[in-house]
Amino acid sequence: MVMEKPSPLLVGREFVRQYYTLLNQAPDMLHRFYGKNSSYAHGGLDSNGKPADAVYGQKEIHRKVMSQNFTNCHTKIRHVDAHATLNDGVVVQVMGLLSNNNQALRRFMQTFVLAPEGSVANKFYVHNDIFRYQDEVFGGFVTEPQEESEEEVEEPEERQQTPEVVPDDSGTFYDQTVSNDLEEHLEEPVVEPEPEPEPEPEPEPVSDIQEDKPEAALEEAAPDDVQKSTSPAPADVAPAQEDLRTFSWASVTSKNLPPSGAVPVTGTPPHVVKVPASQPRPESKPDSQIPPQRPQRDQRVREQRINIPPQRGPRPIREAGEPGDVEPRRMVRHPDSHQLFIGNLPHEVDKSELKDFFQNFGNVVELRINSGGKLPNFGFVVFDDSEPVQKVLSNRPIMFRGAVRLNVEEKKTRAAREGDRRDNRLRGPGGPRGGPSGGMRGPPRGGMVQKPGFGVGRGITTPRQ
């Protein structure tokens, strides 16, 4: 059977997940990702106010990491890019936010070059590492509240398979599927204009991996090729948290630490990443979808992030040539049955011209044109009675200037508009939302697709089938 070589994106995402988890749990072990020829440049200024120079070699990198005083370090990954580079290496670029010692989150960018270790196929170590804070480069301190890092759980669109620690005589093994999801965020640049958007598969999903104890909140998008799924499904947060309670990096690293707890630096082999070659995978078709449920905390945070302009009621429209009055005018509310929605208006249309046109059907008491920049424009016509409204509707199609067909509809009531939105949300792209719980979790355990595993100490492998 022909074995597939793991994609750079799969290698990069799994490396990112484990790197920032170790940064949170055991920063004194971080140097094991590097080798004797590795370089490490971390954001910061030297005594002269210039960007600090890079350090080289595992020993110097360990000193540099310890000088950063990483304590309770939380990371929110917004985006990950990974591409193949020279000599079968992988270059990984990470963008996100980092909080050290419970301080405010700061935006950062970090670039890794993963090079083949050489002794075994699909085994990597960090050859180059460059880290910069955005505020040190562009100025200005861009922050987000720290509580979001500890409490917020983004809504992933694929259920995440829980990690598992598998002991073996040859060392400690760690196996985890990369979560598939779709924000956005997000954040990918995650723009969510509506509190309840319809789920749509997107190429770069973003999720938060939030563990039960204060650990790195890792948001990352999984590659689309990990699982073929036609529609996204939100993660079941509670079971994932219950399973994660059994996992601790302390149990992983304690087997490789000396009794005193000190980390030997001299002569320590580089922490390498072994990525087993994946086998051809069978296509899996999801039989059911997980009912989407948005946590109230997540909903509240999303609404706070969106800058919602204050809603304004309809303003009375002045007649053409009417002098502007300085006194505030009283707003008059008209019944919906007296109003018409007018779409497909020419961009150069004049209010007086449009009003004269509709005066042929009845007395126009108010006319509004919305020209928000998107063509064609639209507006509303208000009559003094419901009879002209029905007269216009019965004479459709309405031709303006003899050539422009206007889209004329009766204005819907607020209850009708909310009912339409509710129906659209319940309908969704694949029928009514909901259905049996416990949908597809991704590739079945023991299946054909293997995820890269990472660990510390004597190298990295994955559990045997």
Curated annotation (Swiss-Prot):
- The UniProt record lists the EC number as 3.6.4.12, 3.6.4.13
List every position bearing Asymmetric dimethylarginine.
R427, R433
Catalyses: ATP + H2O = ADP + phosphate + H(+)
Q: Where is this region: Acidic disordered region?
A: 142-224
Q: Which residues carry this modification: Dimethylated arginine?
A: R458
Q: How is its activity regulated?
A: Under physiological conditions, G3BP1 adopts a compact state that is stabilized by intramolecular interactions between the RG-rich and the acidic regions that inhibit phase separation. Upon stress, polysomes disassemble and mRNAs are released in an unfolded protein-free state.
Instruction: Please give the residue positions where the record annotates the modification Phosphoserine.
Output: S149, S231, S248, S251, S371
- Boundaries of every NTF2 domain copy: 11-133
Residues covered by region (Disordered): 144-330, 411-465
Q: How is it modified after translation?
A: Phosphorylation of the acidic disordered region regulates stress granule assembly. RASA1-dependent phosphorylation of Ser-149 induces a conformational change that prevents self-association. Dephosphorylation after HRAS activation is required for stress granule assembly. Ser-149 phosphorylation induces partial nuclear localization.
This protein's assembly is summarised as: Homodimer and oligomer. Component of a TAU mRNP complex, at least composed of IGF2BP1, ELAVL4 and G3BP1. Binds to the SH3 domain of Ras GTPase-activating protein (RASA1) in proliferating cells. No interaction in quiescent cells. Interacts (via NTF2 domain) with USP10; inhibiting stress granule formation by lowering G3BP1 valence. Interacts (via NTF2 domain) with CAPRIN1; promoting stress granule formation by lowering the saturation-concentration of G3BP1. Interacts (via NTF2 domain) with UBAP2L; promoting stress granule formation. Associates (via RG-rich region) with 40S ribosome subunits.
**Description of its domains:** Can mediate both protein-protein and protein-RNA interactions via the NTF2 domain and RNA-binding domain RRM; protein-protein and protein-RNA interactions are essential for undergoing liquid-liquid phase separation (LLPS).
Question: In its UniProt entry, what is this protein called?
Answer: Ras GTPase-activating protein-binding protein 1
The opening ranks of the lineage are: Eukaryota, Metazoa, Chordata, Craniata, Vertebrata
